[in-house]
Amino acid sequence: MSVRRVVVLGITGSIGAAALKLLRRFPDRFLLVGASGHRQTEYARALAREFSLSDITMTGSCSEQEGRARIKRLLSSCEAEVVVNGIAGAAGLFASLEVLKTRCTLALANKESVVLAASLLHAAARESGATIVPVDSEHAAIFQLIAAHGAHAVAQVVLTASGGPFRTFSKECLAHVTVEDALQHPTWRMGKKISVDSATLANKALEVIEAVQFFRIPVDRVTVVVHPQSIVHALVQCHSGETYAQLSVPDMASPLLYALLYPDAPPAYQTPLDFTSGLSLHFEPPRVDDFPLLRMGFDVARAQRAYPIAFNAANEEAVRAFLQRNIGFLDIAHVTAQALQEDWRAIPQTFEEVMACDTRARMCARTCIAQRWRER
């Protein structure tokens, strides 16, 4: 059994932590040959020593252009078979496209890459013969379910959402949510940005867009349900009437292991669910009136063009402002909605055009944030 050469981008983040857990657990299956991080330089140095790397590429103290150049040099020098892209936010798109210039497998945890530029990703993969395997638990589940039953058999895709820490909060209570409140996710341990996205349901909105664009299915065939236990990660409903689900304990290492070894079957890793212990599963509809970013996600997925880019960029800026305590929790949706009022009907054809739209949307969001700040 051969050892797979692995590069982990974003090794100091939550996806990086999950990848490291697997590399330590299966040293006979994986060899870490390269990695990047954004900050936490001392931690990165310790990881380099642990995994016998000469260096870990760091991007937090340099310009965006230099950071991209460093990622490009890293990828061209490692001869990896699998690259995990755990870079957070729109910054991960450049890395995804660079990975796909090779023939290796892209284990894609950076959902923004698909939201911003799915057509560019698919084209790059076709040209090089590379493979993209999603690492998001929901999309990994859909990927596996479609592989098992065939895309032609699937009538509807159902994404599950935990509902976040404020699932039962009234609109009045949501107005008083603090940064500390928003970072307390009931199920997953994640970085600050994605924790806030989970609290607003923006994360699920991005996953709706990702599902539509990655699997090339109409938005009307995608549904979201709230499932607080986070045990059912996704379901597919077939034309024949059956519904199939993927269930496992909530742990990012499981879909990541699947992607690292694809197309080979992963070894036993998790303890199976015990259905004799009184396990119960609860589902409920999302409260889209109180969490409007989810509805925006469906609208954006339907509109396509540059609207997904604008949605993602404006939300990123709004979340940053919230974490800096410059706007309130409910203002995140307001800022994003305001940015979407601009004209985003152009269809970006290149990475540069995608990033130009991203920049324009961020400027719109910052203008709105400044106005909200003055009104406080």
Curated annotation (Swiss-Prot):
Write out the entry's keywords from A to Z: Isoprene biosynthesis, Manganese, Metal-binding, NADP, Oxidoreductase
An example Gene Ontology molecular-function term: 1-deoxy-D-xylulose-5-phosphate reductoisomerase activity
EC class: oxidoreductase
Positions annotated to bind NADPH: 12-15, 39-40, 110, 112, 191
Q: Which residues bind 1-deoxy-D-xylulose 5-phosphate?
A: 111, 137-138, 162, 185, 198, 203-204, 207
Q: Which reaction does it catalyse?
A: 2-C-methyl-D-erythritol 4-phosphate + NADP(+) = 1-deoxy-D-xylulose 5-phosphate + NADPH + H(+)
Biological processes, Gene Ontology terms = isopentenyl diphosphate biosynthetic process, methylerythritol 4-phosphate pathway involved in terpenoid biosynthetic process
The keyword Lyase is assigned to this record: no
Q: Which residues bind Mn(2+)?
A: 136, 138, 207
Q: EC number(s)?
A: 1.1.1.267
* Family matches, as InterPro entries: DXP_reductoisomerase (IPR003821), DXP_reductoisomerase_C (IPR013644), DXP_reductoisomerase_N (IPR013512), DXPR_C (IPR026877), DXPR_C_sf (IPR036169), NAD(P)-bd_dom_sf (IPR036291)
Pathway, per UniProt? Answer: Isoprenoid biosynthesis; isopentenyl diphosphate biosynthesis via DXP pathway; isopentenyl diphosphate from 1-deoxy-D-xylulose 5-phosphate: step 1/6
- Describe the family membership recorded for this protein in Swiss-Prot or TrEMBL: Belongs to the DXR family.
Q: What does this protein do?
A: Catalyzes the NADPH-dependent rearrangement and reduction of 1-deoxy-D-xylulose-5-phosphate (DXP) to 2-C-methyl-D-erythritol 4-phosphate (MEP).
What is the protein name given in its UniProt record?
Answer: 1-deoxy-D-xylulose 5-phosphate reductoisomerase
Q: Which organism is it from?
A: Treponema pallidum (strain Nichols)
